[in-house]
């Protein structure tokens, strides 16, 4: 059975870092945000937080709250891998989409970090769609919560706290991923 491990969490909680760890373990990674960023560019827009948020909201409004997840399903299947990581679930409709597609093979891991910690990370990472103030991060949180992010986080199978050192977080993510790798290889 194919296993999908998806990361959910508020912006800058550590989803991308967790996905990097998975990639280092040779687990294919599908980044849901890339679907949005691709659509932003397709529409000829500047890839900033405002446009990214607008396009993400528009896709969900026009195609349904699971629009991004549905666009990722074929990418997941095309990997041909028994274990795939999905970075960036944003709402409960996406969780439901993946659970419908992959059944018990879908595992949702929430990553938690406090607002102040997340904002300090945003300031360091320098992505074009990042916000430049803590109020901007709060607004992004509110936008993503409006997509059902809170319900998605509550629906997670496992939570990893990312409030400590990078080394601690990497170890925690490694432990969780290795647990699923091990259970996958035993079948």
UniProtKB/Swiss-Prot annotation:
Keyword ATP-binding: yes
One of the Pfam families matching this protein, by short name: AAA_17
Top-level taxon of origin: Archaea
GO molecular function: ATP binding
Keyword set, alphabetical order: ATP-binding, Nucleotide-binding
Binding site for ATP: 9-16
Keyword Nucleotide-binding: yes
Family: Belongs to the UPF0200 family.
HAMAP family reported for this sequence: UPF0200
Protein name as annotated: UPF0200 protein MA_4660
Organism expressing this protein natively: Methanosarcina acetivorans (strain ATCC 35395 / DSM 2834 / JCM 12185 / C2A)
């Amino acid at each position: 059975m194919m296993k999908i491990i998806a990361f959910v969490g508020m912006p800058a909680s550590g989803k991308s870092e967790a996905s990097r760890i998975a990639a280092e373990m040779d687990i294919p990674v599908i980044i849901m945000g890339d679907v949005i960023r691709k659509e932003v560019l397709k529409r000829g827009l500047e890839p900033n937080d405002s446009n990214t948020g607008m396009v993400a909201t528009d896709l969900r409004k026009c195609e349904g709250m699971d629009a991004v997840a549905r666009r990722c399903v074929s990418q997941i299947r095309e990997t041909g891998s028994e274990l795939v990581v999905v970075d960036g679930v944003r709402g409960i409709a996406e969780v439901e989409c993946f659970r419908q597609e992959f059944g018990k093979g879908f595992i949702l891991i929430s990553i938690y970090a406090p607002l102040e910690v997340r904002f300090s990370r945003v300031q360091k990472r320098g992505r074009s769609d990042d916000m430049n103030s803590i109020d901007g991060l709060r607004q992004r949180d509110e936008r993503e919560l409006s997509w059902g992010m809170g319900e998605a986080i509550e629906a997670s199978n496992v939570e990893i706290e990312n409030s400590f050192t990078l080394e601690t977080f990497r170890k925690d993510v490694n432990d969780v991923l290795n647990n699923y790798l091990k259970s996958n290889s035993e079948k």
